[in-house]
Amino acid sequence: SKITMESTTRREYRRLGESLAFIKSLDWNAKTVIDIGAAWGTPELLQAFPNAYHILIDPVPTYEERFKAILDRYNGEYHLCAISASPGKTYLSVPGSGQEVSSQLSISQESENSISVSVETLDSLFVPRPLDWPILVKTDCQGYDLHCFKGGKDFLQRVDIAICEVNMFRPTGRPDLPDFAEIVT
């Protein structure tokens, strides 16, 4: 169904679960969900759209077993790669155990706390293939979200809803991660 300003409230939604419940209340249902920066998976997306085809994307290899477990219960696939404006390779800052917040923004070369990862674009992954519509894309890329979208100029024309999980304010203890104002400027 078509969503118009007349059919929506002007309320701010701060939590992903709240936002998805509102979207569902408008009788909208995703057939394809693309979760960029999926890490451990996004339970709110899985629960809101249990019958959708879920595409989980994260470059950190330690999440692979978790992705396999999720896809034992939900229909979909996973990709162990970063998403950016252009394809190639990059170094990813992975603090501690490799299962914490990682970011492409924090590092540009190899270091003790980095891993080399392949980089794809949304266009290279999804333009050549058919996906069931409607499509929802969620990013949680620790400040790299707009870079993801820059590599999806053609694909994004097929996307119905795009959600960026960003920090409104700089996270305590992570001065390398941007806040909302830095991401959108």
Model-identified regions with their sequence ranges:
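Phosphate/nucleotide-binding beta-alpha loop and adjacent structural elements of enzyme active sites
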Residues: 2-185
